[in-house]
């Protein structure tokens, strides 16, 4: 079972871009500044560097977060250009796609006519792994399934060797096969890894600087990421292999192998994203010391053609990203949202996330919808947590419940633009969703947003009253206020897979998947944001509430507990993604799962949205703004 759905060959899909451009409306009017923050002398010092107070034009003293402004000027975004949308690049890519298919088809078969069976299993696994990490697997779904069916036909409880006639299984082939087969929905047990442990449960590897030995442990480490709950051997494999690799990388010269180890140790699996991995692997695969390019051509494999195709596909998609980003930036300008100077404007960063996880050209509606929705969520978060008054928040909630453009007239001036932006974004996404779902999903989505805003309101009440809830009370509300459901629901409905209500409930509220993903997002966010949130007057976090329930615990104790919860959730999410009896299309499961990976990556070092000037800025450049050299 493939993790990525099939897609038509065309990489440009200009029709959506053209249609969305026509939907852009001119700025409705000059936007008044009533309710905006007066920058400058109206700021008054506060007790924290993370919180500032400002006097708004209506005379109220309001709390605002001390966030940096938008990093990506619209003029800069509109000036972006690339030649990779030209037909000649697409034509060359199509030719290479055909040649790579021939590589798959010429692999050794059971009759042994194509090649000796000494390496027929590991070569298939290497090809599948390579096209996936290079970001070109969508073109080879049939070939990948055929290759993995072949490998699986020789799989047994003791693992596999390099070839079908191998007398003994080996760690490298077995770990690679286990990881790839499990990710594609084949039934494989982690018990197979116990074959390579001694009687004390230790993996029998001596320290080595040989590339073959180190790469074997690297593949064991990669396999350990795809753990399900209760798989102790996977935990043991991760502990052993991570320690081994950290020691080994210090002893080998800088090379494609050291670069690959550093990246894998840094990002693992659940803090990674498909396009980010592709961008890194292009450097690894094309490194002068790469063993794959050293081989260059074998009887059926041409690594240079794989690399050329991957670079072309990366850059062709890059041309589509530019068009979508230019549309999104115009939407942001025309929406009036830039006038809300107290808010975090991170539409470019959210688009980067969406295009790093939804890498098929045909999923433009998902990418743009996710970016819009997340940006609206962030601005509303700044209103509900800091800038807005309780009376204003209740007015906004009522306007969303009534769901009529005329409701904006009852709102404060600064809320009118965000209300209309939300109204128009959800309405537009519902139209896109109707094309694939065959029904109007707007009311369903709107109800989800009502619940979401109610959870925000609860947090605002806690802030206003200084109330610190119990951990259970906090987490129950936080599963909704994390925003995962609001961010994911409507974009998922735009995917090209039917999600009738009975199926949708298996991935949306009240499903186990939604519960886990929402809990994960809030808990991971808390571990990175709780100190800054506390400085802004937001006392309630999973850390503080857990400490309240358990007097005598330190912050470090609470953090350790929350991180342990996160690790358990990741394993349960792996199961929800890959369990064999799910009736939810893999495309929908995969995109919902990728959203958790994306947010995990952004929260890896810090709150990468509030502070988007460091790793997040680099992510935008490497995966969206810059093509790779051909």
Swiss-Prot record:
Pfam families of this UniProt entry? Terpene_synth, Terpene_synth_C
Which biological pathway? Terpene metabolism; oleoresin biosynthesis
Provide any one GO MF term from the record.
Answer: magnesium ion binding
Binding positions for Mg(2+) 1 per the UniProt entry: 381, 385
- Transit peptide: first to last position: 1-48
Q: Which cofactor does it need?
A: Mg(2+); Mn(2+); K(+)
Entry keyword Chloroplast = yes
Q: Would you tell me the Gene Ontology cellular component terms?
A: chloroplast
Motif DDXXD motif located where?
A: 381-385
Q: Does the keyword Metal-binding apply?
A: yes
Question: Which EC class is the enzyme in?
Answer: lyase
Binding residue positions for Mg(2+) 3: 533
Annotated catalysed reactions: (2E)-geranyl diphosphate = (-)-beta-phellandrene + diphosphate
Residue pairs linked by disulfide bridges in the UniProt entry:
none
List ligand-binding residues for Mg(2+) 2: 381, 385
Question: Could you give the cofactor binding note from the entry?
Answer: Binds 3 Mg(2+) or Mn(2+) ions per subunit.
Keywords, ordered alphabetically:
Chloroplast, Lyase, Magnesium, Manganese, Metal-binding, Plastid, Transit peptide
**EC numbers, comma separated:** 4.2.3.52
Which example biological process does GO assign this protein?
diterpenoid biosynthetic process
Q: Where in the cell is it found?
A: Plastid, Chloroplast
In its miscellaneous comment, the UniProt entry states: The conserved 62-Arg-Arg-63 motif may play a role in the isomerization step of the terpenoid cyclization reaction sequence.
Q: How does the record comment on the protein's domains?
A: The Asp-Asp-Xaa-Xaa-Asp/Glu (DDXXD/E) motif is important for the catalytic activity, presumably through binding to Mg(2+).
Q: Name the PANTHER family for this protein.
A: (E,E)-GERANYLLINALOOL SYNTHASE (PTHR31739:SF25), ENT-COPALYL DIPHOSPHATE SYNTHASE, CHLOROPLASTIC (PTHR31739)
Family membership noted in the UniProt record: Belongs to the terpene synthase family. Tpsd subfamily.
Question: Main role?
Answer: Converts geranyl diphosphate to four products with (-)-(4S)-beta-phellandrene (52%) as the major olefin, and lesser amounts of (-)-(1S,5S)-beta-pinene (34%), (-)-1S,5S-alpha-pinene (8.5%), and (-)-(4S)-limonene (6%). Involved in defensive oleoresin formation in conifers in response to insect attack or other injury. Involved in monoterpene (C10) olefins biosynthesis.
What's the protein here called?
Beta-phellandrene synthase, chloroplastic
